[in-house]
């Protein structure tokens, strides 16, 4: 249970500074504050890399995070100043040496193009790098059964809990870190706290969709910028519409745009970016899967 994880490490970071975390004698994690997001680096020693390489080359369960080698992290960017736990609402992030990556919020998988991840295999172990842009953080309760119109504002205290699962010795071993709470300067996170998504929807229209979103301004200052609508056609991603946005202080604004789908045998997704007057992304939505009207995947 998340609420049973006790705080043992509290660290204040400036931009460019890192907090090291030891999961066990084979596993080290480094949390680094960047000016636009949080970076997590794993360094995993492994004496049986031959087994690891073969497993993720040929095993049919190589995508399964509950088998093989797995890095696991619970993360809450919404922890209070006195938080002693990785508390609701939390993310769960998992990865393995096959470069399979999983990210869930409120226990629901929500891929986001802005979140970056990579894996490096070495002779004596493997490494993982994750980057979570502040602009990509989830800001509303998107679950269909939710009865609350809740928005989540990222805070200055981020709580982490790390664990590693390994079976290269022939038996499953799971080790975990203490809870780590990282405090970041308010001026770093504030530009990404002003504009929140309060909703995000897609509706079919012919061979395309209408994408709509509700924006909320949490600040006593007006926000002026743009919303960019991105279409993913397979691996190709491009801006298909742009709208000017003027959010009054503590006010709301709705945007919508039709998105036409090209006749291609690919999977489609759409995501939105809110950018300020300097064209800096301050809010990036999760990827919205769109049904292909020509091909059934």
Briefly describe each language-model feature range.
Residues 9-234, 242-297:
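Structural preference for beta-rich elements and adjacent junctions enriched in aromatics
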């Amino acid at each position: 249970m998340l609420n049973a994880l006790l705080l043992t490490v509290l660290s204040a970071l400036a931009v460019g500074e890192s907090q090291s975390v030891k999961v066990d004698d084979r596993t080290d994690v480094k949390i680094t504050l960047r000016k636009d997001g949080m970076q997590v680096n794993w360094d995993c020693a492994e004496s049986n890399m031959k087994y690891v390489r073969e497993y993720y080359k040929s095993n049919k369960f190589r995508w399964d995070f509950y088998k093989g080698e797995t890095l696991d992290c619970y993360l809450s960017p919404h922890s209070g100043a006195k938080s002693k736990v990785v508390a609701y609402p939390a993310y769960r992030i998992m990865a393995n040496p096959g470069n399979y990556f999983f990210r869930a919020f409120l226990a629901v998988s929500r891929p986001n193009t802005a979140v970056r991840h990579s894996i490096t295999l070495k002779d004596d172990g493997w490494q993982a790098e994750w980057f979570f842009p502040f602009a990509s953080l989830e800001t509303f309760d998107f679950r269909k059964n939710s009865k609350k119109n809740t928005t989540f504002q990222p805070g200055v205290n981020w709580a982490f809990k790390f664990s590693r699962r390994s079976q290269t010795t022939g038996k499953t071993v799971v080790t975990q870190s203490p809870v780590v709470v990282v405090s970041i300067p308010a001026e770093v996170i504030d530009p990404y706290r002003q504009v929140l998504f309060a909703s995000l929807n897609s509706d079919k229209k012919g061979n395309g969709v209408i994408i709509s979103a509700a924006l909320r301004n949490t600040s006593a200052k007006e926000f002026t910028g743009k919303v960019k609508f991105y279409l993913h056609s397979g691996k190709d991603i491009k801006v298909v519409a742009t709208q000017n946005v003027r959010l009054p202080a503590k006010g709301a604004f709705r945007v919508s745009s039709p998105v036409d789908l090209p006749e291609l045998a690919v999977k489609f997704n759409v995501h939105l970016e809110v950018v300020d007057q300097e064209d800096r992304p301050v809010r990036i939505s999760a990827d919205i899967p769109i049904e292909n009207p020509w091909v059934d995947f």
